[in-house]
Amino acid sequence: MDITIQHPWFRRQFYSFFGPNKMFEQCFGEHIQEADLFPSSVLSPFYFKYPFLRLPSWIESGLSEMRLEKDKFSINLDVKHFSPEELKVKVSGDFIEIHGKHEERQDEHGYVSRDFQRRYKIPVDVDPLSITSSLSPDGVLTVCGPRKQGDVPERSIPITREEKAALGAAPKK
């Protein structure tokens, strides 16, 4: 029986392509493909599991993106399976909480019910009272708030020399 041996330098460089897919990633719960059930070496010693080939599966999952730009903080969350009445967005302490739930209903594969909750830490320079949310026609929920503009001018900080060692060792002469 022939056994394919891959050299460590080759395997290490492309480990993410050869290694098994991570089960507990953001698109957990989506359907699996037949190729996911086998290690790549079973299918062929030269078979690669390119992550970008799974793009359609990723697009259909509830992807989340958080951005901290110069003038604003924003969250984009795919909630296309929920109506506005099934979504709740609230500020609780230093967090934005987004909750979506719909009861069992029929889709093209059978019956499905969905329930999710996500929490995002509000940056310290964003006023929680200024946060707004909107839902696009294609099902993307956007939660955003302006960042406070700091008018702190740039300045040089002088370095002073201390006589006592910081780590408790005697200074070298």
From Swiss-Prot:
Residues 54-162 form the sHSP domain. SUPFAM superfamilies: HSP20-like chaperones (SSF49764). Zn(2+) 2 binds at residues 102, 104. Keywords: Acetylation, Eye lens protein, Metal-binding, Zinc. The keyword Metal-binding applies. InterPro entries: A-crystallin/Hsp20_dom (IPR002068), ACD_alphaB-crystallin (IPR037882), Alpha-crystallin/sHSP_animal (IPR001436), Alpha-crystallin_N (IPR003090), HSP20-like_chaperone (IPR008978). Pfam families: Crystallin (PF00525), HSP20 (PF00011). GO terms for molecular function: metal ion binding; protein homodimerization activity; structural constituent of eye lens; unfolded protein binding. Zn(2+) 1 binds at residues 81, 109. The keyword Metal-binding applies. GO terms for cellular component: cytoplasm; nucleus. Belongs to the small heat shock protein (HSP20) family. May contribute to the transparency and refractive index of the lens. This is Alpha-crystallin B chain. The lineage of its organism: Eukaryota, Metazoa, Chordata, Craniata, Vertebrata. The gene is CRYAB.
